[in-house]
Amino acid sequence: MAKEKASSQEQEQKVKDEKLKQLNLAVESLEKQFGKGAIMRLGDDAVVQVPVVSTGSISLDYALGVGGLPKGRIVEIYGPESSGKTTLALHAIAEAQKAGGIAAFVDAEHAFDQSYARKLGIDIKSLLISQPESGEQALSITETLVRSGAVDIIVVDSVAALVPQAELEGEMGDSQMGLQARLMSQALRKLTGAISKSNCVAIFINQLRDKIGVMYGSPETTTGGKALKFYASVRLDIRKIAQIKDGTEIVGNRTKVKVVKNKVAPPFKTVEFDIIYGEGVSRIGELIDLAVELGIVKKAGAWFSYENDKLGQGRETVKTLLKADEALFNKIYAQVKEQMVGLKLEGSSDDDSSSDS
């Protein structure tokens, strides 16, 4: 009986070994045909930490779970008008350029503001910009730039402005049902693989529309059909929640961003920061909020203190101080970043780190 059991186990092992041998041959064949990394085991060393491009916001980078927008993926930024969508995308371009990357901006809205982009830290001279005449042209330009493998980040502003050629050639009032949705679906099928191979971040800015006749749930939806929702690895919902005033003058907006979808880390995190008119994301204001939250800067009533020294009374006073004292800003920034990395490492044992949708 024992001999029969041993013989049966040997036979099973032989079958397993033969299967493994055939599998390895198939993997080798696929790698020869399609290149290294075309197929891999999740436990292989080839799977490394996701390379990213910073958003320009410390808190949003942290909320994204990997330190920024993942390279080789599609990102959708959507929200109401004047909520900060383009500002956030321009900050990402500036960060990519600072890291030595090449950036492109497909301006389908024909509304690119050079002076504002320069204020956000973008090198205008090296930025590739296109103002296409139709949706097909915009997506064709995007595909060509992505397939070149030389572009690190590309922004399409916006999906709503990608007008199909047939609609442009038609008469006002002609019904063109589903043309834009079909255009986006077809383009994204082609783009997804190319974006992954080129390690480029593709940001699509989108607008909101109201669905007609919705009684329950949110009536809001994004333009361009459902394809972008599925193909995007990260979706960011950006909204302005309050005005920032200097006396009676409105100088900016308090902005809330929710990570609605995230395929590289846990989703549904929400962050808030200031967007100042003409300056973009207020890194100083954001740093103060995070430093207080992490206990690096102490707040008692309206007074702020750091390492037993009083910084000032009121948030705006502290912002002015940190703007003037770069050394102090850098010192607090380094401590905040160090603590946030520590928090991320402590929370990195979660098994379920992706959104299903």
UniProtKB/Swiss-Prot annotation:
ATP binds at G79, P80, E81, S82, S83, G84, K85, T86. One of its GO terms (biological process) is SOS response. Keywords: ATP-binding, Cytoplasm, DNA damage, DNA recombination, DNA repair, DNA-binding, Nucleotide-binding, SOS response. GO terms for cellular component: cytosol. It holds the Pfam family RecA_C. It is found in: Cytoplasm. SMART domains: AAA. InterPro entries: AAA+_ATPase, DNA_recomb/repair_RecA, DNA_recomb/repair_RecA_CS, P-loop_NTPase, RecA-like_C, RecA-like_N, RecA_ATP-bd, RecA_C_sf. PROSITE patterns: RECA_1, RECA_2, RECA_3. Can catalyze the hydrolysis of ATP in the presence of single-stranded DNA, the ATP-dependent uptake of single-stranded DNA by duplex DNA, and the ATP-dependent hybridization of homologous single-stranded DNAs. It interacts with LexA causing its activation and leading to its autocatalytic cleavage. This is Protein RecA. It comes from Chloroherpeton thalassium (strain ATCC 35110 / GB-78). The gene is recA.
